[in-house]
Amino acid sequence: MPRKGPVAKRDVLPDPMYNSKLVTRLINKMMVDGKKGKSQTILYNAFEIVRERSDKEPMEVFEQALKNIMPVLEVRARRVGGANYQVPVEVRPERRTTLGLRWLVNYARLRGEKTMEERLAYEILDASNNAGAAVKKREDTHKMAEANKAFAHYRW
């Protein structure tokens, strides 16, 4: 923990095309080896694929997808009297967004399509329709929280 108090949150700049901080955060989350330009190109091309496939604005589809991925509850380990309990806790709004973006990128990378643009586009489309691996991850997280509801009184 820092001795000089809490570390200030860095604010990201909105991206040039959609003027959205959320898109910038997704670009940063996808970035590998500091290649932000490449990450940006991949995302914008993926958004074009989304526009072609869904006949809707890609930002609308992306925001709906993210809404369907973001978890409300998660479990955190809490040690009580020599036993570890999985305690369900509510997820803070900032962490919800972060987890949603992380799961979207991770499960897009695991898909079978040929290019990352296609993988990301189809994962966004699937998530916006409440399908896909990222949405399944959210469902699994919620199931774990539901299964451990008995330990909710250990919250801190």
Curated annotation (Swiss-Prot):
Keywords: Ribonucleoprotein, Ribosomal protein, RNA-binding, rRNA-binding, tRNA-binding. GO terms for cellular component: small ribosomal subunit. GO terms for biological process: translation. Pfam families: Ribosomal_S7. CDD domains: uS7_Bacteria. It comes from the Bacteria. One of its GO terms (molecular function) is rRNA binding. One of the primary rRNA binding proteins, it binds directly to 16S rRNA where it nucleates assembly of the head domain of the 30S subunit. Is located at the subunit interface close to the decoding center, probably blocks exit of the E-site tRNA. HAMAP family: Ribosomal_uS7_B. Part of the 30S ribosomal subunit. Contacts proteins S9 and S11. Belongs to the universal ribosomal protein uS7 family. This is Small ribosomal subunit protein uS7. It comes from Bacillus mycoides (strain KBAB4) (Bacillus weihenstephanensis). The lineage of its organism: Bacteria, Bacillati, Bacillota, Bacilli, Bacillales. The gene is rpsG.
